[in-house]
């Protein structure tokens, strides 16, 4: 993926419209190309990468379940989920829905399913950011809906590199589509990343 991305950038630099970006070689630990790499911006659903890490590292119940509640609907107004409400769903299925389909409700359900409150979970996300040296990063929710979730491209390189150690994150985030088992139903979802959905790239992590 990284070779292809660099090739595109070198041939067509005018196609790059991001306010900031980093092309990073994880094999040799070096920046290949960047623009405003330390600029702090809202990171939206990239937040879910940290949510996945914190959940996997803190959940001690392999059989845990969680339900989408009215509180989730009140917080995430204006967004949609295919997952049923008030239905116990396996945390593994919620993780799949979050990483494949970027489901905001799944992210919020997971944030109170690892043996702590939602606020404690957000605190763990910020602690992990500091541990990884992500000095420009702050989290205020687990889905990325809040504009208060901020980071820089260079900080996100650190998060991506750390996430490479978790096969579950790598495998789920790169599935073009998936079936989520919820309340006796199989809910079909597609990856929200078109490049992954159409299998344009063989990504290290998405």
Task: Locate the predicted segments by residue.
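Active-site-adjacent loops and short helices of periplasmic peptidoglycan-processing enzymes
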Residues: 16-167
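Non-catalytic cell-wall polysaccharide-engagement segments
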Residues: 2, 124-127, 192
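Domain-terminus/edge residues, biased toward the C-terminal soluble/receptor-binding domains
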Residues: 135, 147-151, 155-206
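Intrinsically disordered, low-complexity boundary segments flanking structured domains
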Residues: 10-11, 51-55, 181-182, 191-192
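Sec-dependent N-terminal signal peptides
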Residues: 2-13
């Amino acid at each position: 993926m990284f070779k292809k991305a660099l090739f595109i950038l070198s041939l067509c630099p005018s196609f790059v419209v991001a306010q900031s970006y980093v092309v990073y070689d994880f094999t040799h630990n070096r920046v290949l190309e960047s623009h405003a790499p330390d600029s702090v911006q809202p990171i939206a659903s990239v937040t879910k990468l940290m949510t996945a890490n914190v959940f996997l590292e803190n959940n001690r119940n392999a059989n845990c379940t969680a339900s989408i509640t009215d509180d989730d609907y009140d917080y995430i107004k204006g967004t949609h989920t295919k997952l049923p409400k008030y239905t116990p769903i396996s945390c593994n299925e919620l993780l799949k829905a979050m990483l494949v389909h970027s489901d905001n409700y799944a992210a919020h359900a997971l944030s109170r399913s690892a043996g702590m409150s939602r606020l404690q979970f957000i605190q763990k996300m910020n602690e992990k950011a500091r541990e990884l040296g992500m000095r420009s990063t702050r989290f205020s929710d687990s889905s990325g809906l809040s504009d208060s979730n901020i980071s820089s491209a260079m900080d996100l390189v650190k998060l991506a590199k750390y996430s490479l150690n978790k096969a579950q994150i790598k495998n789920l985030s790169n599935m073009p589509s998936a079936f989520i088992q919820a309340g006796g139903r199989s809910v079909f979802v597609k990856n929200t990343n078109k490049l992954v959905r159409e299998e344009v790239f063989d990504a290290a992590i998405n």
